[in-house]
Amino acid sequence: MRRIGFYLFIMAVFLLAPLLALPQKAVPAPAAVPTPTPTAVARAAAPYRAVWVSYLEWEQVDFSSAEAFTQAIGTMLDNIQSIGATVVLAQVRPFGDALYPSGYFPFSHLCTGTQGQDPGFDPLALLVDAAHARDLQLEAWVNPYRIQAGQTPALCGASPARLHPDWVRYTDTGAYLDPANADVRQYIADGVGELCARYAVDGIHFDDYFYPTTDPAFDAADYAASGTALARDDWR
């Protein structure tokens, strides 16, 4: 019996040997877990809380020198920052004039009391720098059409109203560039282009302006020449 058992064992070894010699199926290694790429944490946009600085406020600011102006706007901007505002909408073109040296508009009378008179420094450049130093955005506020409110200001020879009298229309409230005039619209656009090219302003703000009047006589010739099928109010 022992001999029979021995022979059975030998036969089993010979039968299993080919199977053991077969190549083993490769077991795939577990896939590497990719390391996540760090991503920048999105910063919430600062809330848009704006303060207007109009020509009425500029009348209270000292433009007598760059130093006096810098001190005055520093106090003003500190106050604006203290109330949680993030944006300053500074009126820089109030009456077809400018609070900066321009190839299109004379210096504002707000700078010296006389339109066209150079204050000896660039108020807007100082204002932009002072605002940005306080992490405030500075948008340049433009009144595109108004030249005078009543008789204010007294116009200098470099005013668009003096250089291009055919661009101007008059009402009982003052003098305005004619919105219907294509040359006027281009002039306004060129003035905005100058602002954007020369100053690091954070936006252009059109405000404090309206179509000068509802009187049909104001732009009757322009309306007739346009050949439009639109009603006058829609055309305006």
For every predicted segment, state its role:
Residues 43-71, 128-129, 139-198:
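Active-site-adjacent "subsite" loops/lids of carbohydrate-active enzymes
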